[in-house]
Amino acid sequence: MSASPARSRVSPEIIVVCGCLIALITFGPRASSGLFQLPMITEYGWGRDTFGFAIAIQNLLWGVGQPFAGAVADRFGAFRVLCVGALLYALGLVVMAYATTPGLLHVGAGVLIGFGLSGCSFNLVLGAFGKLLPEKWRPMAFGAGTAAGSFGQFLFPPIGNVLIESFGWQQALLVFAASVLLVMPLALALATRATGDSPQAGPAAVPNQSIRQALAEAFKHRSYVLLVLGFFTCGFQLAFITVHLPAYLKDAGLSAAVGGWTLATIGLANAVGSLASGWLSTRMSKRWLLAWIYLGRSVAITAFILIPASPVTSILFGISIGVLWLSTVPPTSSLVMLMFGTRYMAMLYGFAFFSHQVGGFLGVWLGGLLYEINGNYSAVWWLSIVLGLASALINLPIKEQPVVREPALQPAE
């Protein structure tokens, strides 16, 4: 028998709305980071590799912190983790605003924002959805939470662009910092602590299964390992494009506004793609859905870099890559929950997300490094294409079924 689900006095509708607002608020400033690259390096005389390395640290530490934040949320509830994460995130934006040296930039934009995101991003929201919502709500809620983060990417870059042009990049970062603090009151709706697996079509629950047992079980499961490996590409592509696309378009002779609106278009298209992915996750094979997403990204990137850049091609690329942007999240999170249940979902999805963020670290860092070496981004664009094709193949052998647990498995002492 599965343990009873988390009890909440908050209706599912309110849980979803508050969780989606948290995802929107926390994803927006992070998705706008590319807008600050040229103003900051111009003012301080840094290279693009300096800014890129700071965001690379952010991606890596977001990934490093995610499993631990997920484990704490699984044990004690999401509210405290979300509040601490929001405080670190806001502090990181403030430090970034006043960073006059590469070291301070790396601390603010890298360390503080990275760990802050691990504690308050949409990944924690999805884990809370898995525990607090009835089973029938979950796939669409995963899509809605991901789409809300995507809408943050649509909403914040144009706002950031206007703030930078009107008040300067430092003031824009301070406004973003204030907005992140809104996460704290919204997190009250996700404050319930779950006591075990919620009823679902998944593996038989193991009473008092320890974190160590859960991790050992997961990393011995071939399908989970393949899922984790495939997610690396998602992070590589997304982080590289988020940070370096505005500069790539500026190098092509386009205005900064085109870069901002292209990022915004990605966010808006992603909202549609994430909702569609959540819906499709309930109606088709999740591994095939992931394979088609990764293949589609490679096709979109290939077309974009082979066609001369213009405002029209930039927006069209934003639409095509945006539909596929975070559409990997609903099938990935659903597969983790299908394989292992809800009890340690936030932690196990966190380890998958760590792979995602290692990819993000390399995508951002290599983007800046290879630009300084070669004077262009061509090598990283082509690497993104190859990785997309590889991940499409990696996901195909995944078995969409719960992990087999021996009835005689004993609980932890």
PLM regions with names:
Residues 145-196:
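Helix-loop-helix hairpin linking two adjacent transmembrane segments in secondary transporters
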Residues 87-100, 296-309:
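C-terminal ends and interior cores of transmembrane alpha-helices
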Residues 109-147:
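Cytoplasmic helix-loop-helix junction between adjacent transmembrane helices
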Residues 65-77, 274-285, 372:
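Helix-to-loop junctions at the C-terminal end of transmembrane segments
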Residues 31, 59-67, 153-154, 267-275, ...:
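Residue-level signature of mid-helix packing/kink "hotspots" within the transmembrane helices
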Residues 33-37, 219-274:
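Extracytoplasmic gate region of multi-pass secondary transporters
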Residues 40, 119-133, 327-340:
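Intracellular juxtamembrane helix-capping segments at the cytosolic ends
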Residues 104-120, 232, 313-327:
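Hydrophobic core of transmembrane alpha-helices in multi-pass small-molecule transporters
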